[in-house]
């Protein structure tokens, strides 16, 4: 090769190498931003589909399809939440298949009592957990520690209350959803008698079908064997595309 051609080829190679290196650095920085604690998180369609091949119970289903008559009030798809920001792109409620089955059974029993479920939140992408932690400036009393991830990120936790299906009104509870005060604790008793009774009814029926409580949020319930499910950072839109 002529010297000029050689120089030109070397310049092109150097440019190509530089582009590749910059791409790798950019990808690494994005990964660090999305998963700063280096957790095992499934965040692509391929990873999610592979998990379905391992166990069909890993499937995310839409609670609207699986729980007849359930009412959704997905606060994080609005600004009516503790962040004051819209966090979700759409007001959807997804959960793992066993969780949806249990909620369907609960809804059927509640129907015999003239009651029903309202869902405030279900599966939550890990990116939202990072955002909540940032908003709360590191306070993990009411938001999940991002170095562990939330059970919502695993698709096996739900935030719910009871309603009267006839008029859609919520039953009286100790506090509104996402009230970060001592009154939200499941053992707080300085409350109206009706609120205590309704809270106990909710806890009793949820625990009977495999859910457990957490101390400081009367509305939050984790399904049994929750740790068996992977942390997820798959968007609602991605789940919809996969389900088509």
Regions found by a protein language model. Give the residues of each.
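Short active-site loop/helix that positions an aromatic residue
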Residues: 132
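Conserved metal-phosphate-binding beta-hairpin within the catalytic cores
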Residues: 221
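Segments that shape or occlude catalytic/ligand-binding pockets
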Residues: 125
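Bacterial Sec-dependent N-terminal signal peptides
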Residues: 1-37
């Amino acid at each position: 090769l002529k010297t000029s051609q050689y120089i030109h080829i070397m310049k092109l190679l150097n440019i190509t190498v530089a582009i590749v290196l910059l791409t790798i650095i950019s990808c690494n920085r994005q990964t660090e931003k999305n998963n700063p604690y280096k957790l095992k998180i499934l965040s692509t369609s391929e990873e999610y589909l592979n998990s379905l091949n391992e166990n069909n119970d890993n499937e995310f289903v839409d609670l609207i399809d699986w729980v007849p008559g359930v009412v959704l009030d997905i606060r994080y798809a609005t600004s009516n939440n503790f962040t004051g920001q819209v966090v979700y792109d759409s007001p959807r409620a997804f959960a793992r298949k066993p969780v949806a089955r249990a909620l369907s059974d609960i809804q059927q029993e509640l129907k015999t009592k003239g009651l029903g479920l309202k869902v405030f939140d279900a599966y939550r992408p890990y990116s939202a957990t990072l955002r909540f932690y940032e908003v709360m400036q590191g306070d993990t009393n009411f938001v999940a520690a991002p170095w562990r991830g939330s059970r919502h990120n695993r698709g096996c936790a739900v935030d719910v209350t009871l309603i009267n299906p006839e008029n859609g009104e919520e039953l009286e509870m100790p506090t509104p959803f996402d009230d970060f005060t001592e009154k939200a604790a499941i053992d707080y008793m300085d409350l109206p008698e009706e609120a205590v009774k309704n809270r106990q009814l909710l806890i009793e029926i949820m625990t009977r079908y495999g859910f457990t409580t957490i101390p400081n949020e009367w509305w939050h319930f984790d399904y049994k064997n929750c740790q068996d499910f992977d942390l997820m950072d798959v968007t609602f839109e991605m789940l919809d595309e996969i389900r088509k």
